From Swiss-Prot:
Residues 91-97 are annotated as: Complementarity-determining-2. Residues 76-90 are annotated as: Framework-2. Sequence repeats lie at residues 26-35, 38-47. It comes from Mus musculus (Mouse). This is Immunoglobulin kappa chain variable 6-17. GO terms for cellular component: immunoglobulin complex; plasma membrane. Keywords: Adaptive immunity, Immunity, Immunoglobulin, Repeat, Signal. It comes from the Eukaryota. Residues 130-138 are annotated as: Complementarity-determining-3. The mature chain has 12 additional residues at its amino end, due to a tandem duplication of 36 nucleotides after the codon for residue 36. Residue 42 corresponds to the N-terminal residue of typical kappa chains. Residues 42-64 are annotated as: Framework-1. Residues 98-129 are annotated as: Framework-3.
């Protein structure tokens, strides 16, 4: 199933998928959103780093590579300690409602980048990329952003 038209409908589908995944996990927070790899043909999403350390005010970028062309059907999520994941970016570069403009996304095809232009203390979290070009949607392994004091 390939998605070519993006918008509100896709945002809702992404959120529904995450909520269903959380519900099936039987946990409220601190889940590990791993790749749904293992089935032949599943798209593997590989994030550049498992950990990144930065300081308040710095610019930081996280990259994500898809194992095949996924057009611009990539979302980015933020999961703070003890909380459920929140959608930040959908369709590679569109900020979800209420997301601060310091968060941006870019890319298409196989290479994607998520950037925080000026890191704030509250940005301490794990960030995940996800493709929804094909079923099942698959996640990157996550990048934990640590803030230097």
């Amino acid at each position: 199933m390939h998605h070519t038209s993006m918008g509100i409908k896709m945002e809702s589908q992404i959120q529904v998928f995450v909520f269903v995944f959380l519900w099936l996990s039987g946990v409220d927070g601190d889940i590990v959103m791993t790749q749904f790899a293992g089935v032949d043909g599943d798209i593997v999403m590989t994030q550049s780093h498992k950990f990144m350390s930065t300081s308040v005010g710095d610019r930081v970028s996280i990259t994500c590579k898809a194992s095949q062309d996924v057009s611009t059907t990539v979302a980015w999520y933020q999961q703070k300690p003890g909380q459920s994941p929140k959608l930040l970016i959908y369709s590679a570069s569109y900020r979800y409602t209420g997301v601060p403009d310091r968060f941006t996304g870019s890319g298409s095809g196989t290479d994607f980048t998520f950037t925080i232009s000026s890191v704030q203390a509250e940005d301490l979290a794990v960030y995940y990329c996800q493709q929804h070009y094909s079923t099942p949607p698959t996640f990157g392994g996550g990048t934990k952003l640590e803030i230097k004091r």
